[in-house]
Curated annotation (Swiss-Prot):
HAMAP family: Ribosomal_bS21. This is Small ribosomal subunit protein bS21. The gene is rpsU. One of its GO terms (cellular component) is ribonucleoprotein complex. Keywords: Ribonucleoprotein, Ribosomal protein. Residues 64-73 have a biased composition (Basic residues). Residues 47-87 are annotated as: Disordered. It comes from Caulobacter vibrioides (strain ATCC 19089 / CIP 103742 / CB 15) (Caulobacter crescentus).
Amino acid sequence: MVGLSNGEIPLVQIFVRDNNVDQALKALKKKMQREGSFREMKRHVHYEKPSEKRARQKAEAVRRARKLARKRAQREGLLPMPKKPGR
């Protein structure tokens, strides 16, 4: 996101090879997901008050901290490792 100012969404470029539009759409969706474009667009649908923004950011930070603590506890053997699906 170099050179972007005032919250602009970066342009994503995808090449269509051999008229394979389905594969190009899949690649576009994956790229936008990785860059966080969907989340950003969803966030800009409605105005978010500064107090709501702070509350959201704080909740996200708490969620990240809990996840990190849970992973750390699992690594140290304090919690059982999560079960893998399909096994």
